[in-house]
Amino acid sequence: MDVRQSVHSEHAKTLDTTELRKKFLIEQIFTPNQYTMTYSHIDRIVVGGIMPVDGEITFDDGIGKQFGVNYFLERRELGLINIGGPAKIVIDGTSYEVGNEEALYVGKGAKALAFSSLDSAKPAKLYYNSAPAHAVFPTRIITQDDAIKAPLGDVKTCNKRTICKYLVPEVVETCQLSMGLTRLAEGSNWNSMPTHTHERRMEVYFYFDMAEDTIIFHMMGEPHETRHLVMHNEQAVISPSWSIHTGVGTKNYAFIWGMIGENLTFDDMDHIAMLDLR
């Protein structure tokens, strides 16, 4: 497990490119026949990917000890979105099939989780976030039809996109985890611009569906002290509450966002005026 400590905004603005990447960028999300796990001290989020190709993947028996509990989700909830082929997920004996760009919410207390692909030639790619949880809510699949779709932006401002909200209160009950998927239209390359921060929440972006020869310049930092990270396909970035989070790609792309913190109000944002950015 990769552990990332919290970084103060005053410290962050002194970091060079290498250190910024080390502190905030998660370069490897998917590894065939393995799971990855990054544990951030910021709001205690866990981020990772599960990619079963041949056979079944389960979390290691000792993973609970790293969280001071008996098993991973003893005091946690988990949300995942599949960006690969269809997956079979067995949770405490109950089987779920999760298709491409479908989500699964797993409630606190789920003990035995097993992940496999229905077709090894088209392996599942299960991107997940996990947050501390205080209550038990039912495990359930969220399909694309279940998700709330919201068009945003405009071709004229190069930010036309569709937000698909999977784990939000209007769709599924969670303790504090929100997740969704945003896809940019062809010809658009800016996400979340005009930008914002969340004083009351942190967020993680996971960029995917990028052509091999394309990159994204992900903007971060305080509004008056912005920095950038160059990112490639299927990489994630941790965004503290004090940081803006926006990006521009050399071609259109998609990304999954996950938030945890004080509330589940999607629109609870602190908007930043364009003229105030530095």
Curated annotation (Swiss-Prot):
Q: Tell me which EC number(s) this protein carries.
A: 5.3.1.17
Please give the organism: Pectobacterium carotovorum subsp. carotovorum (Erwinia carotovora subsp. carotovora)
For the protein in the UniProt heading, the enzyme class is isomerase
Function of the molecule: Catalyzes the isomerization of 5-dehydro-4-deoxy-D-glucuronate to 3-deoxy-D-glycero-2,5-hexodiulosonate.
Q: Which HAMAP family match?
A: KduI (MF_00687)
This entry's comment on the bound cofactor is:
Binds 1 zinc ion per subunit.
Keyword Zinc recorded? yes
**What is this enzyme's catalytic activity, as reactions?**
5-dehydro-4-deoxy-D-glucuronate = 3-deoxy-D-glycero-2,5-hexodiulosonate
Give, as in the UniProt entry, the pathway in which the protein acts: Glycan metabolism; pectin degradation; 2-dehydro-3-deoxy-D-gluconate from pectin: step 4/5
The protein in question is named 4-deoxy-L-threo-5-hexosulose-uronate ketol-isomerase
Q: What are this entry's molecular-function GO terms?
A: 4-deoxy-L-threo-5-hexosulose-uronate ketol-isomerase activity; zinc ion binding
Entry cofactors? Zn(2+)
Coiled coil ranges: none
Gene Ontology biological process terms, A to Z: D-galacturonate catabolic process; D-glucuronate catabolic process; pectin catabolic process
What family, per the record? Answer: Belongs to the KduI family.
The record's listing under InterPro entries reads: KduI, KduI/IolB_isomerase, KduI_N, RmlC-like_jellyroll, RmlC_Cupin_sf
Disulfide-linked positions = none
